[in-house]
Structure formats: C-alpha cells, structure tokens
C-alpha cells in the first residue's frame, strides 16, 4: 500500500546571527537568547498540533541548551546543522556535531543540513556517519545559489539520500522560510497543496529566531515580517489547513528516508 504524501516540518536551530548580515553587532549570548525565545513559540505550536518535526541543531546551540536537548520529545527527530552557524570545517564539524548531539541526547543522529543551504561534498557527509542530507534548495536564489537544474525530488547519490527543500512543480518557486513569511497564507497554502499532489512530499524549513521579536534590529522588512507574533498564528493556520484537508502525513525526515529505502 502506497504511503500518504509526506509533510516534513523542519527547523534549523542555530545562533541568531541574521543581524550580523546587516551590520548590527549582536553577541553570542543574545543570539542564543533570541533563538530560545523563538524556538519556544515554534515548539508550542508543534506540540499543540501534535505533529512531529525534524530539528537540525548546531553544536553551539546544543552546548548551551543541554537540558532542552535531553528533554526533547522522542517523536521529534534531532539532526545536525553543523557545529557553528557562522563558519564550517567539513573535516571536523560534521563529525563533532553529530557526536555531540548523540552524546547529549542519547539518540542516533543520521541527518545533516548545511547552514544557509550551502553545498557540502557528499563524501565528507558520508564519512562523518550520516544517512541523508537536506541542504539542496533546487531553485535560484540571487546571491546565494543557482540549482535550477537540480532534482526537485529525493534521490540517492554517492551513498546518501538527498532530500531537497520543496519548490513548486512549475517555475520552482521556493517554499522556504522567506516565502512563508512574505506570501499571503492562501497563496502559500495552494503552493504547498500543488507540491504535495505532484511531488508526493513537502519539505518546509524555518528558523527559531523568525518567531522571536526582531523589531530592535535594523533588518529588511522581508526578513523581519511577522516577528511580533503574526508568524506564530500563520504557522498554526498552515498546520491546521494540512490536517483539515487531509493533505498528507506529518513525518520526520528520518522516517521519510526509511520509507524511500523500503520503496514505499
């Protein structure tokens, strides 16, 4: 029997360094505090909706939030987002972040996503002990990357499953955090529905600091929009829409990969 379309909600738990990109100085303690506040709001929505999510966490965040890592509900998946969000050494950070997360959580960590969806060599990811990665956004983001020729569907390559972030079937409109934040909900919902119907899965990703109050920072409107609580309500509405319409099954990325391996 074929599985229902998979709805994969993911969040990149990291230091809130977005103000640094726009010239605002923010120390590590404040970065972590903003991420904690936003993550609390996100997880509250997820908990109330009783759906699982996949948490890609940096080693730095984990080191400073050990109790949260230990207490994380087992229905959620813990995966790696590298050790630091601001810089990356594939020869050390891939392995060290996985080992740290496993030590703190007592769980096996099999998934990886690179900060800012940047490319990492599959050989390095595989050597560090991962089963899958989700660092590909198969679209064009000016100034970031151009993956217009990349697969929009999951694929197995060089010993790893690659689970792309979702884009629409037509025109490859990215259904990433900026789209959720800036598109009217009715349009974003329709894009998600079309993508689930055509691709059979939906891989959405968010950041905890999006759900915190960012009004004190000099960020562009398209980055800070919804940070005073509106985005929390929007996420609630989106999940409720998926549930009421019966559009698919909420699942962790690890379990989705298991389905792929089993050919379902």
Please tell me what each predicted stretch does.
Residues 2-74:
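Active-site beta->alpha N-cap acidic-glycine motif
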Residues 12, 46, 55, 81, ...:
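Conserved, mostly hydrophobic/aromatic
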Residues 26-33, 58, 82-89, 109-110, ...:
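The substrate-binding groove and active-site-proximal loops of carbohydrate-active enzymes
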Residues 39-43, 66-70, 94-98, 122, ...:
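Generic structural signal for well-ordered alpha-helices
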Residues 44-50, 185-264:
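C-terminal domain-boundary segment and adjacent tail
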Residues 49-121, 135-136, 167-169:
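Metal-dependent polysaccharide deacetylase catalytic core of the NodB/CE4 family, i.e.
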Residues 103, 107-205:
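Active-site-adjacent pocket scaffolds in enzyme catalytic domains
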